[in-house]
Amino acid sequence: MSETHLSNQKFADFSLQTEIKTALNESGFEYCTPIQALSLPILLQKKDIAGQAQTGTGKTLAFLVATFNHLLTTPIPEGRQLNQPRAIIMAPTRELAIQIAKDADLLAKHTGLKVGIVYGGESYEVQRKVLDKGVDILIGTTGRIIDYVRQGIINVSAIQAVVLDEADRMFDLGFIKDIRFLFRRMPDAKSRLNMLFSATLSMKVQELAYDHMNEPEKVEIAPNEKTSKNIKEEIFYPSMDEKMRLLLTLLEEDWPDKAIVFSNTKHSCEKLWSWLEGDGHRVGLLTGDVPQKKRIRILELFTEGKLDVLVATDVAARGLHISDVSHVYNYDLPDDCEDYVHRIGRTGRAGKKGVSVSFACEEYALNLPAIEEYINHTIPVTNYDSEALLDDIPAPVRVHRKHNSRPQGRSGSGGKPRSGNRNAPRRHDKTRRHS
């Protein structure tokens, strides 16, 4: 979580428990973001909300503060058993669940409340041992939560607070039946604090809210501004032959500290990885085929700055919660307009500036009109000089090579780094962009 100064509302002005205020202060949080300033007054009155907010707006901190405060100010259910958590936070992806849990740990340290996390792809027994000790706040993906519920390892009949994060993504991934399964086994909606957050409050999301919540109040943040003003957007029209050279040239020119390159298919991502690796970049690959432990390790290296570029499909697009991403490159324009918003939302977060670069090639240029209509603005076109593109590009690494999750490229293995570190001399000193 990162501090932002996007409103004049201070956390200190809310009637929060001292333990929470102390944790917020220690973590450097003083001012609220708009979603926090709007939602917390409602939630602290123990009223439900359905919030529309993009990732990077501070919604995670909003619902975590509300959840912790609710548990600290609400009596523990009489006869509560060790296998009965008091709050449950459901997320669509493992990466998002992991990030929420990290943020929850910051708030939990003075409260005495125990946080547990469960998700697929990791040891069932290791996670079960944590649950056997009892948790107050359970964070996880619905599939793994249901596994434990069906086996009696978790009982949700004492739940006092529920969070459903990125509800629209839940629909996209087909998790709604799982969610309804869990809701039916919880106490009545009127006896819980219910929170739903979604990038879009579509009719199907609102229906879910009203079916399983207690007259939630709708909270919307800039509904007509689907992309952040902190993100500088630009689009290029490369030929298929020049597309890869243009990307490598722009990466050389921009020299981003932390960049994500999105492509529409696993095959294309693997191709991108092989060229970037061969060109000496420290690059990680995230697709649906990457094993869970490796995914976590790659994200850790990227977060720590030991990888500079992450190549990803949309499987990872909405689950990535990484601070300080300076650039997003849409190597392919997405087929789904919402995916464009979610992709570029990885940068320009927490009040910081970001850059989004998109390629409208022959194959995907037809997606652009729908995207621009959806985001309510035209993306500025940037021209480039074909003759100025890099031509001394090393051959790509063979795709079948095992993708190491250790740091690569400019400071280590894989490809030939230009001089072994981030201070390697660049291959040009003039811009390739032309207005």
Swiss-Prot record:
A GO CC annotation given for this chain: cytosol
Binding of ATP, residues: A53, Q54, T55, G56, T57, G58, K59, T60
Q: Which residues form the Helicase ATP-binding domain?
A: 40-219
Motif DEAD box: list the residue ranges.
Answer: 165-168
Q: Where is this region: Disordered?
A: 395-435
GO biological process per UniProt: RNA catabolic process
Q: Where, subcellularly, is it found? A: Cytoplasm
- Return the motif ranges for Q motif: 9-37
The record's function comment reads:
DEAD-box RNA helicase involved in RNA degradation. Has RNA-dependent ATPase activity and unwinds double-stranded RNA.
Q: How does it assemble?
A: Component of the RNA degradosome, which is a multiprotein complex involved in RNA processing and mRNA degradation.
Official protein name in the record? ATP-dependent RNA helicase RhlB
Q: Lineage of this protein's species?
A: Bacteria, Pseudomonadati, Pseudomonadota, Gammaproteobacteria, Alteromonadales
